[in-house]
Every structure is written in C-alpha cells, then in structure tokens.
Regions:
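Class I S-adenosyl-L-methionine
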Residues: 2-96, 183-184, 188-189, 197-198, ...
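Generic beta-sheet signal
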Residues: 9-10, 37, 100, 120, ...
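Short beta->alpha connector loops
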Residues: 13-14, 130-132, 150-152
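Short gly/pro/ser/thr-enriched loop/turn and capping motifs at secondary-structure boundaries
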Residues: 14-16, 42, 104-107, 153, ...
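Conserved beta-strand scaffold positions in the cores of enzyme catalytic domains, especially
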Residues: 34-36, 97, 126, 169-171
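Short, structured patches in soluble enzyme cores that scaffold and shape functional sites
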Residues: 38, 73, 128-130, 148-149, ...
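Class I SAM-dependent methyltransferase SAM-binding "motif I" and its flanking Rossmann-like core
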Residues: 75-140, 190, 204-206
Length: 206
C-alpha cells in the first residue's frame, strides 16, 4: 500500500470507505491518490459484472500512465472478494496483477472466539451469504463457516436450532471493528445484526 501512489477503495452509497479506513490505521497513506469505487449489492450477475468493468475502467488510466494501483479489501482477496473480480477484469485486459494475502474474516472470527476451525481428518466448509440449502450444509461433517449472515440471522438461527447446533455455534459481527459483537451461542439473539456477521458451526457429531 505504501509503495503504490494510487489506492482504489470500495465506497458505499453513503460515502463510507471501510477498507480504506482500516488500511489507514496500519499504513502511511498520506499523499496518495484515492479512487473511490462503487459496487451494486446485487444478485444479478450482469449487474455485478458491469460494476467490476466500471471499476477496471477507473483504474486502467492510472496503470496506463505508469502508476501502480493497490486496491484495499476486507479479509483475504481470494475469498468472496470484490477486489478479486476487479483484478480478474484487469488481467483479462492484459494488465499485470498481483494478489497480496490478507487475514480471512473467518480466521479472525475464530481467533476472537478462541476456537479452532479444523479438527484432524474433518473438513472445513465455507458458505457465502444466502447459501441455497442451509439444512443440507449443516448436515455435512466438520466445521461450517456461514459468512455475512447478518441479513438472514433469523433463518440461520432457526436452522441451527432444527439441527441441535444453536447452543454450540457462535458468531462474531463486525470482527476487529469498534462495533464488534461476540455471541458465544446462537440462542437469544437480537433481531438485527450487522451484515458482516460470521457464524462458526462445530461438527454436528460433537
């Protein structure tokens, strides 16, 4: 980040750039050119693709001028990351790209809970927001990670209860932020939880 003269940062409709704010606490970014990038929160693949192309359109002139661009991202760029799709679009256009690993959100959540994500010989399953068949997912062996569960917290908690997993599952919302909330169990939850809520579900046989 400090080596690149230009920083690309996702921006919400309200103007917030959370990933940039976090990065500013870890690196000296004074004097950088900041490119705010807006992305539609849509399940329509065509709408999302248009957003990634628009972001690449904003970044490409900087690269053409010989200026390296770093795009900040929440979590790790290889895991359900908007930044990766922008990178992929730029790569298709012939630009050199590089991925820098970050701390995956679910790894940070596991650390906040003091839990391991894996056990010997058992798999780890990672599910994005709105996974189509949560009941089938919860029946799988091993630990389950349910990412960005805040919008469907009621449905998630109900599914965990049906499988007898609510007491042993845990959740962290806004992990690492001043607004962080830790829930050691998935019972008695408030009606509204931050979108950035990750649930850790232990192996169903435990």
């Amino acid at each position: 980040l400090e080596a690149c003269p230009v920083i690309a940062a996702p921006q919400t409709a309200s103007g917030e750039m959370l990933a940039l704010s976090i990065a500013q606490g870890a690196a000296e970014l004074g004097g950088k050119t900041v490119l705010p990038l807006s992305f539609a929160m849509s399940r329509d693949a065509a709408v999302r693709a248009a957003g990634y192309a628009h972001a690449a359109d904003a970044i490409a002139p900087e690269l053409d001028a010989g200026r390296n661009v770093a795009m900040v991202n929440l979590g790790d760029v290889s895991i359900y990351a908007t930044a990766y799709y922008v990178l992929d679009e730029l790569r298709r256009r012939g630009y050199d790209t590089r991925m820098v690993p970050g701390v995956a959100s679910f790894s940070a959540v596991a650390a906040a809970l003091g839990r391991s994500l894996t056990e010997m010989e058992l798999p780890l399953h990672i599910y994005p927001a709105g996974a189509s068949d949560l009941d089938a997912a919860l029946a799988q062996p091993g630990t389950k990670v349910l990412m960005k569960s805040g919008k469907a917290i009621g449905e998630t908690a109900a599914a965990l209860s049906r499988h007898g997993l609510a007491e042993d599952s845990a959740m962290v919302a806004d992990c690492g932020l001043p607004t962080q909330q830790v829930f050691e169990t998935m019972t008695g939850l408030p009606e509204k939880i931050s979108y950035f809520a990750t649930v850790i579900v232990p192996d169903s046989k435990k």
